[in-house]
Amino acid sequence: MKTPPKPALPHEFPGAVWYGDEEIEAAQRVLRRQSPFRYYGPECGLEVARFETEFGRFLASPPGMPWPDDSGLYVTAVNSGSGALEVALDALGVGCGDEVLVQGFMWISSIAAIVRNRAIPVLVDSDDTLNMDAKAIRARVTARTKVIMPVPMLGGVARMGAIMTEVRSINAERLSRGLPPIKVLEDCAQALGAHARGVPGSLAPAADEGVHRVGAFGDAAIFSLQINKNISAGEGGMIVTRDAELHRRIEALHNAGYAKDADAPRNWYGDAPLGWGHGRRMSELQGAVARVQLRRLDGILANMRHSHERFEDHVRRLGMTPRQHADTTHPGDTGYYCIFQLPPGPKDEKGKIIRGRAVAAALNAFALHPWFLHDFEVHVYYNIEPLVAKLPVGNGCPWRCPRNAFHSAYSYARGALPKLDEALVTHVGINVPSRLTREQEDDIISALDYVFKTVIQE
C-alpha cells in the first residue's frame, strides 16, 4: 500500500489556535489601564469579575441555548486548574483522616491535590467511557470518605446521572447512620462545554432531570484554562458551586484566607479569617483573554465535534470500536480526543503492549499526536511514580500521619483497577485539532486507513 503524505495540520491546542485581534485588544486594554491585579490598582476589577459572571451564565445554559441572566451559580476564578482543585478540596474540609474517591485515568493534579491536602486517594475502577464507573463506587466508600471526584477525561463525559443517583443513595444511608454526606467535586479541567444527562445534587435533586453542562452536577466543580484546554488564558482555573457558604470559603481560601463578610471589609482581602489562603488569584490579563475565548467556545466545540464524528465513523468502518459515549442518543463529549479500541489481537498482555506501541508509533509518523493509553504518562495512575511510591508532601504527610494509617490497605501499582488496566492496553487515541479543514480531516482518515492496513491488520 502506498504511504500517504504526512499531513500539514494545525496545532492541537483548542482555544489558543483561535487567538486573534480580539484577544490582543483585551490584553492591551488591561495594560493601558495599568491594572493587571484584580483587587487594587488604577482601574482594577473590571475583567475577572465579569468573566466569573459570564462563565456562570454559560454553565447554566442548556446546550445550544442563550445564556440566562441569572445562573444560580457562584464562580471563583483562580490562576490554574491545579490550584482550583487544591482550593476546592480545602474548602470542602478535606484533610488528614479523609479519603477522596477518584478514577485512575485522570491528570496527576487530581491526585496531587488530594495528597497536598493531606488526605488519601482511593481509586475507583472505570466503565466503557474510561471514566468513573457508578457501579464501582459503593464498594470503595468507607466512613472516612469525604469527597468523590469524577473526571470527564479528555472531554469524554462520565455517566453523571448514574453517579449522582448512586451518591444520593449512599448519602441517604449515611445520614440514617449519623454519618456526614459525601460531597461530589467534578474535575472538569478537560471538559468545558461538555454535557451529560441526569439529575444534579449529591443529597437532594438540585435541578430537574435533563441535559446539563458538566460542572453543574456536583457540590462543586473545577475547570482549567491551560493551553491544552478548550479555551485558554495560558493558565487559569475556575471553581463553581451552588452553595453560598461553600462559595464563601472558596473565596476566602483562594485569596488570603479571609472572608469578605462586611459590606466594606477592613482590607482588600477580607475581614473574617477562615483558614490559610492559597494565593491563587487570577490576574486581569488572564480574565480579559478568557472572556474573549469564552465567546468563541461554541464554535470551537462545534468544529472539534464535527471532526471527531468523522473520525469515529471511519474507525467503525475499519472494524474498530470508538470510546463509548455516556449517552448514545445525546452525546455530550467535547470532541477533543478520538479514542478507539483496537480489534482483537494478542491474548497476552506483553503482546497487547507491543501492538499498542507499534500503532502509536505508526500514527506518530503522520504527526497525529497519538497516545497508546497504557503509556499516557501521568494521566494513568500506575505511571504516577510519586503515587505508587507514596511519596510525602512534607514531614511524611499524608502517608505517615497517624490518622491516615489506613492507607496501608491501598496499593496504587498496576493491577489495582482491572477493568481500566485492560482498557488501557487495548485503546489508542489521537488529538482532534479545533481548526481542521475538510481536506485535513481527509488526510487524517487516509493516515488511519494506512496504519490499520499496514500495522493493525498485520
Residue map of PLM features:
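Active-site region of PLP-dependent enzymes
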Residues: Q190-G201, P205-H212, F217-Y337
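Conserved PLP-binding active-site segment in aminotransferase class I/II-type PLP enzymes
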Residues: M1-G83, V87, I163, L424-V425, ...
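Conserved PLP cofactor-binding pocket of PLP-dependent enzymes
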Residues: Q190, Y258-W268, R310-G319, A358-H427, ...
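PLP-dependent aminotransferase-like
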Residues: D90-G198
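Intrinsically disordered, low-complexity Ser/Thr- and acidic-rich flexible linkers and loops
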Residues: P62-S71, T165-I182, G198-H212, E349-K350
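Short amphipathic alpha-helices in soluble, non-transmembrane regions
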Residues: I250, G351-F366, I444-L448
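Generic structural signal for small/hydrophobic residues in well-ordered secondary structure
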Residues: A26-A27, F55, A84, V100, ...
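Conserved PLP-binding active-site segment of the aspartate aminotransferase-like
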Residues: A326-E349, P370-G394, V425-E439
